[in-house]
Amino acid sequence: MGQKTHPLGFRLGITQEHRSAWYADFKHYSTLLEEDDKIRTYLNKLAKLASISDIHINRNGLGDQIELNIETGRPGILVGDNGSGIKTLATNIKKFIPNNRQITINVVEVENVNANASLIADLVVQQLEDRVAFRRAIREALQCLQDNQVNGIKVEVSGRLNGAEMARSEWIREGRVPLQTLRADIDYATKEANTIYGVLGVKVWLFKNEILKK
């Protein structure tokens, strides 16, 4: 039986970089990893409202200085008036990590929302939760193919589509999405839509271009 490889993990070190960049000895590794998970869980709760697409966590050698780089399509919501939103984020994060941690938060605006798989998946989720037909929601997501930075897109929705008793998956692809080509710059995201018929899964693959190293 065929197994599918995660498009981002498959390309780590080639076209993708690690979302957590730090080193730790065996004694402290699990503690720092758990802290990262708590931070991501908290920020992912804000992802839909603030259009957060990616979270990068960097630490120093001791692990007590944390740098959060948050990529978002709506930076104004996170930053707030005069940076009040950043202070609130830091205060809330410090509630579930040790007091000796120093946090620096950088909010990075996504340059092109039409070339970001996470934000496109959020758009599909929003439409599904607003009871838009799933085929129409997928078709609207495919409009991003008109952007010059996107050469191909694939969108898949799975679950009790249109309230059917039996769950199934349907997908549509436009352009090229070469998942087996390591040099292909693939962006991938998975989301969940809570509908009256249950939870629907949404997956989006974006093929931007091929990265040729000299």
From Swiss-Prot:
Signal peptide: none annotated. SUPFAM superfamilies: Prokaryotic type KH domain (KH-domain type II), Ribosomal protein S3 C-terminal domain. The keyword rRNA-binding applies. It is found in: Plastid, Chloroplast. Its main location: plastid. InterPro entries: KH_dom-like_a/b, KH_dom_type_2, KH_sf_prok-type, Ribosomal_S3_C_sf, Ribosomal_uS3_bac-typ, Ribosomal_uS3_C, Ribosomal_uS3_CS. One of its GO terms (biological process) is translation. GO terms for molecular function: rRNA binding; structural constituent of ribosome. Residues 39-111 form the KH type-2 domain. One of its GO terms (cellular component) is cytosolic small ribosomal subunit. It comes from the Eukaryota. Keywords: Chloroplast, Plastid, Ribonucleoprotein, Ribosomal protein, RNA-binding, rRNA-binding. Part of the 30S ribosomal subunit. NCBIfam families: rpsC_bact. Belongs to the universal ribosomal protein uS3 family. This is Small ribosomal subunit protein uS3c. It comes from Thalassiosira pseudonana. The gene is rps3.
